[in-house]
Curated annotation (Swiss-Prot):
InterPro entries: Ribosomal_bL9, Ribosomal_bL9/RNase_H1_N, Ribosomal_bL9_bac/chp, Ribosomal_bL9_C, Ribosomal_bL9_C_sf, Ribosomal_bL9_N, Ribosomal_bL9_N_sf. Keywords: Ribonucleoprotein, Ribosomal protein, RNA-binding, rRNA-binding. This is Large ribosomal subunit protein bL9. Belongs to the bacterial ribosomal protein bL9 family. GO terms for molecular function: rRNA binding; structural constituent of ribosome. HAMAP family: Ribosomal_bL9. Pfam families: Ribosomal_L9_C, Ribosomal_L9_N.
Length: 152
């Protein structure tokens, strides 16, 4: 069996892993490609310490993002209801439909905080009334808001 060497990746490599991963590769691959092109670093105690420090900072950053998302979800729950005004015809039928852009604008006007329209899931809305809309604030945090569609 061939000898393998350990290196720490300094950038994402599709077939090996992500930046900061400790991987085992063939010695020639490390010596001829990864190390000269700056795609990996040889394993030393200093490099391992640096990688652990970077991982800890990244974990703190991700935890802070999640905490912000949870706080924003609480703020959305506190507001309770968001209103979108649309033009209607007879029997409260809308001309057009309510889109995720409309919901994003309603959230922004109420909270002064931007929400990406791609993170909003709106059910099919063709009449005035109340609807539940899901807003993905973080990969692990989803808020469900009440949307009131009214005629103007």
């Amino acid at each position: 069996m061939a000898k393998r060497v350990q290196v720490v990746l300094s950038e994402d490599i599709l077939s090996l892993g992500k930046d900061g991963d400790l991987v085992e590769v063939a010695p020639g691959y490390a010596r001829n490609f990864l190390l000269p092109h700056g795609k990996a670093l040889p394993v030393t105690p200093a490099v391992l310490k640096q990688v652990e420090h970077r991982r800890a900072k990244e974990a703190e950053r991700l935890a802070a993002l999640k905490a912000d998302a949870v706080a924003f979800r609480t703020a959305l729950d506190t507001i309770g209801r968001f209103t979108v005004k649309k033009q209607t015809g007879g029997d409260d039928v809308l001309f057009g439909t309510v889109t995720n852009v409309d919901v994003a604008e309603a959230i922004e006007s109420a909270t002064k905080k931007l929400v990406d329209k791609r993170d909003i899931t709106v059910p099919e809305v063709h009449r005035t009334g109340n609807y539940k809309v899901q807003v993905k604030l973080h990969p692990e945090v989803v808020a469900e808001i009440n949307l009131e569609v009214v005629s103007h």
